[in-house]
Amino acid sequence: MHEWALADAIVRTVLDYAQREGASRVKAVRVVLGELQDVAEDIVKFAMEQLFAGTIAEGAEIEFVEEEAVFKCRNCNYEWKLKEVKDKFDERIKEDIHFIPEVVHAFLACPKCGSHDFEVVKGRGVYVAGIKIEKEGGS
């Protein structure tokens, strides 16, 4: 499942960072989920908890923040949000975009000029935005 692969990458990132910083414990992790990716937060959280088990990150607080998807037309410079056009997507299209966000260009066009030449300004992908660690001695 795609969410498990994402969770695995997040966990590896967190544990690598903690090791580099000499952490004795990971206390909290903040993860940004891009709206365009349409990730199932509950599955990612469950997977992270399972993958953290037996590590210095076991029991860490996991916080998710959704980043709104914003697009900008390269033709007319119009900016718009996914929520303004999301009703045009059926479940198959949502699934296609979930696995390969770049295909959004095949299904969306600028609401102002109709161009398919646009950039995803934000709201794509998944990334670790913060890691709170504890070092020996409680710092």
From Swiss-Prot:
Transmembrane regions listed in the UniProt entry: none
Keywords: Metal-binding, Nickel, Zinc
Keyword presence, Translocase: no
One of the protein's GO biological processes: protein maturation
PROSITE patterns in the cross-refs: HYPA (PS01249)
Domain of life: Archaea
InterPro entries in alphabetical order: Hydgase_Ni_incorp_HypA/HybF_CS, HypA/HybF
Function as written in the Swiss-Prot or TrEMBL entry: Involved in the maturation of [NiFe] hydrogenases. Required for nickel insertion into the metal center of the hydrogenase.
HAMAP family assigned to the protein according to its UniProt record, in alphabetical order: HypA_HybF
Subunit composition and interactions: Monomer and homodimer. Could also form hexamers. Forms a complex with HypB.
Protein family (similarity comment): Belongs to the HypA/HybF family.
Protein's name according to its UniProt entry: Hydrogenase maturation factor HypA
Organism, scientific name: Thermococcus kodakarensis (strain ATCC BAA-918 / JCM 12380 / KOD1) (Pyrococcus kodakaraensis (strain KOD1))
Gene encoding the protein: hypA
